[in-house]
């Protein structure tokens, strides 16, 4: 059986980074610390890699081996959705270097708001839907 403690701890760390970035992009443009944003995007990326590795190694294999077709279907849905979201995040992360943010601040702020909102929604959905199923299956 899978312990949700580590996944929830990872979510907390990821949400801290998302919240920091959300707060930073809400500042007046002249007050935004681009170096700090780049640092926290890197930190978020590392946390996401660890989280996804653990999900793909431990969480999803258990859910996909469930006797319950609904559980397997839900797991497949979450795998597909996360794949799409990670692709969007990767494009965002690779698009915006420090130089590019300076050159295209308005585009960066718009894209960052969209990506951060989608990420927060995803992790809330995991906790509210996926983790409840895992608890019920246990």
Features from the language model and the residues they span:
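Small-residue-biased structural context
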Residues: 1-138
């Amino acid at each position: 059986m899978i312990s949700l403690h580590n996944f929830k701890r990872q979510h907390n760390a990821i949400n801290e980074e998302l919240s920091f970035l959300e707060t930073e992009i809400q500042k007046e443009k002249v007050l935004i610390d681009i170096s700090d944003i780049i640092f926290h995007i890197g930190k978020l990326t590392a946390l996401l890699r660890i989280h996804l590795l653990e999900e793909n190694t431990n969480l999803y294999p258990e859910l996909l081996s469930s006797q319950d077709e609904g559980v397997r279907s839900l797991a497949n849905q979450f795998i597909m959705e996360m794949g799409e979201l990670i692709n969007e995040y990767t494009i965002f992360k690779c698009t915006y270097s420090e130089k590019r943010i300076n050159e295209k601040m308005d585009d960066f702020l718009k894209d960052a708001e969209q990506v951060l909102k989608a990420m927060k929604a995803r992790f809330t959905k995991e906790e509210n839907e996926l983790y409840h199923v895992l608890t019920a299956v246990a």
